[in-house]
Amino acid sequence: MAGTKEIRTKIKSVQNTRKITKAMEMVAASKMRKAQERMRNARPYAEKVRNIAAHLASANPEFKHPFMVARDVKRAGMIVVTTDKGLCGGLNTNVLRAVTNELKDLQGQGVNVQATAIGTKGMQFLGRIGAKVVSHVVQLGDTPHLEKLIGAIKVQLDAYTNGEVDAVYLAYTKFINTMKQEPMVEQLLPLAADKLSQTEDEKRAYSWDYIYEPDAQTVVEELLVRYVEALVYQAVAENMASEQSARMVAMKAASDNAKNVIGELQLVYNKTRQAAITKELSEIVSGAAAV
């Protein structure tokens, strides 16, 4: 059995670790609230752009943007959104498992895939599996900015517009609530028909017409690009909210486990100390009896 000094050292070490995980839990909780706010604030912009683009598309049915035209998929692009840091439970593992399954399905159909990595963990993973990475962006920090993402996204959008890929997929972790985050792999391009369709309420709300400058086609082309960029930004915002939630939960679990370990070590320490005292008393009594 370990000595009391060794056990005290272990207890001190676990206590120090618990202080770190507790601090990280509190930091993650603070960042999570800010990330959730950014996520909610990003939604109205994307929805407004979608409404305007849908109105223009329905008013000009003769115009078909490449983003709206489905093609036989022989080559595909995939934008993979992950975190830059670890210590967030199985967040990255789950979304990268979904990416692996999607890649296997596409490759099984004879589809060649080129990838864009957003986040260090995804970049490292794609490098390990030998995927073709055509663009990447890492170290976004706690506050993602669209201008940092546009360069990496544009590579995939240009590839689709030029016919180099026939579909683009988006993989990220969707924020459900603090305790639940769901890995997603969605088709980004071509845009699904329901993405640019209006409900009856929306048609009544947007029953008026626009004055197009310079013309409707140019406006629709620009809006659709902005809309797709907004969808990717929304995915990054959701992923960051998921990251902080998962990290807060993981650090809380680590703190709770450390507390349990400290309790167990304290019990062992007390038993060891009691045994040592009992032994000393026995030796004293034996010595006195011998005299």
Swiss-Prot record:
The molecular function terms of the Gene Ontology recorded here are:
ATP binding; proton-transporting ATP synthase activity, rotational mechanism
Q: Does the keyword Cell inner membrane apply?
A: yes
Family to which this protein belongs: Belongs to the ATPase gamma chain family.
Where found, per UniProt? Cell inner membrane
Entry function: Produces ATP from ADP in the presence of a proton gradient across the membrane. The gamma chain is believed to be important in regulating ATPase activity and the flow of protons through the CF(0) complex.
Q: Which NCBIfam families does this chain map to?
A: ATPsyn_F1gamma, PRK05621.1-1
Q: How does it assemble?
A: F-type ATPases have 2 components, CF(1) - the catalytic core - and CF(0) - the membrane proton channel. CF(1) has five subunits: alpha(3), beta(3), gamma(1), delta(1), epsilon(1). CF(0) has three main subunits: a, b and c.
Q: How does it sit in the membrane?
A: Peripheral membrane protein
Q: Could you tell me which species this protein originates from?
A: Cupriavidus metallidurans (strain ATCC 43123 / DSM 2839 / NBRC 102507 / CH34) (Ralstonia metallidurans)
Q: Which GO CC terms are listed, alphabetically?
A: plasma membrane; proton-transporting ATP synthase complex
Q: Name one GO biological process term.
A: proton motive force-driven plasma membrane ATP synthesis
* Name of the protein in question: ATP synthase gamma chain
- Which controlled-vocabulary keywords does the entry list? ATP synthesis, Cell inner membrane, Cell membrane, CF(1), Hydrogen ion transport, Ion transport, Membrane, Transport
Q: Which PROSITE patterns is this protein grouped with? A: ATPASE_GAMMA
